Amino acid sequence: GNTRVYFEADMLYNRRLGKHDVDALFLYNQQAYDDGDIQDYRKQGVAGRLSYTYDNRYVAEFNFGYNGSENFAKGKRFGFFPSLAVGWLMSEEPWMQKYHNIFNKIKFRASVGKAGDDKIEGRRFAYLTTLNQSAQGYTWGTTGQVNYEGDVKGISEGDIGVSNLTWETVKKYNFGFELGLWNMIDFNLDLFREKRSNIFMKRSIIPSQSGFINNPWANFGKVTNGGVEMSL
């Protein structure tokens, strides 16, 4: 049957000093999943968060993840993924209080961060070369393949391992605006942009004399997109 083992340990810190709020978290996690395959699925990582708020008006938060994946060779398994966010709750400024019955919320926020993906479609351990155990057998004389209780199959290379594969990454940028009116209407606006790089793709043009049976994987894809989201 399937078995899953998950271990997590964390440390928390929270303190308020006058108008200052500080919150911190450090977390370690490790997981293994066995679905009856030859090799377990394993991941390991640490994460942290540090946030600061001043007088419920100014907010800053830093997050990070340092994650390891089984899908990459030693030296390429771990990736560092940080993010930073800041915010200003303008409606909490003293000079805005006389308008609070109209503008119950005015908030500006911005963030930048980096995330990673280790999933290679239909392939585990892409840094290892695979072997095909059902290749054409040896031929002797004029009798064809060796027969001993059936054909004796040969072994050939399948996918060639690529040792420098590493995490696919995406950098995210966001600017947001939140507006609340008369405690009845909420309006949100988000401008975002994403730059994805090191995308897992198979090389499409490989010379036949290279000897590759199948085109190898590589981190070379790039995609950039952005947009605007609004809600009312």
Spans of model-derived segments:
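Extracellular/periplasmic, surface-exposed regions of secreted and cell-surface proteins
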Residues: 1-232
